[in-house]
């Protein structure tokens, strides 16, 4: 069997790592070992933060919806409960967009949710 010399493949692999490490500071963009270590960490951070971004956006949408809902005299959790009871299927991303860009439509949705809610159990009873 013929001997395989790794020179070409090794240089190609190193070149790819250094190419992807472009923009890192100092030795991390110039020295292969440092660049590879930083590149591995970068890929780990990217993977983790792609997942974290989803929860961060959901939190942002909920804050926006809550602020706009309170301007309409209802809290976030009561709004979501009312939407479920009224069988209005609008996700939080769309609700947040409506709250920011089309407040009149959001107000109409809030009114529909309020109408679907049962009487408040915490309200004083008229005896």
UniProtKB/Swiss-Prot annotation:
GO terms for biological process: ribosomal large subunit assembly; translation. Pfam families: Ribosomal_L20 (PF00453). GO terms for molecular function: rRNA binding; structural constituent of ribosome. It comes from the Bacteria. Transmembrane segments: none annotated. The keyword Phosphoprotein does not apply. CDD domains: Ribosomal_L20. Keywords: Ribonucleoprotein, Ribosomal protein, RNA-binding, rRNA-binding. HAMAP family: Ribosomal_bL20. NCBIfam families: rplT_bact (TIGR01032). Binds directly to 23S ribosomal RNA and is necessary for the in vitro assembly process of the 50S ribosomal subunit. It is not involved in the protein synthesizing functions of that subunit. Belongs to the bacterial ribosomal protein bL20 family. This is Large ribosomal subunit protein bL20. It comes from Corynebacterium glutamicum (strain ATCC 13032 / DSM 20300 / JCM 1318 / BCRC 11384 / CCUG 27702 / LMG 3730 / NBRC 12168 / NCIMB 10025 / NRRL B-2784 / 534). The gene is rplT.
């Amino acid at each position: 069997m013929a001997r395989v010399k790794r020179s070409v493949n090794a240089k190609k692999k190193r070149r790819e790592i250094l190419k992807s490490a472009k923009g890192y500071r100092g030795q991390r963009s110039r020295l292969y070992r440092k660049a590879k270590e930083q590149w591995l960490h970068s890929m780990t951070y990217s993977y983790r933060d792609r997942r974290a971004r989803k929860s961060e956006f959901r939190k942002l949408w909920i804050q926006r919806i809550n602020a706009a809902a309170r301007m309409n005299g209802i809290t976030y959790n009561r709004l979501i409960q009312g939407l479920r009871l009224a069988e209005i299927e609008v996700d939080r991303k769309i609700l947040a967009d409506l709250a920011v860009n089309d407040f009149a439509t959001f107000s109409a949705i809030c009114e529909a949710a309020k109408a679907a809610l049962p009487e408040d159990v915490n309200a004083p009873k008229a005896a």
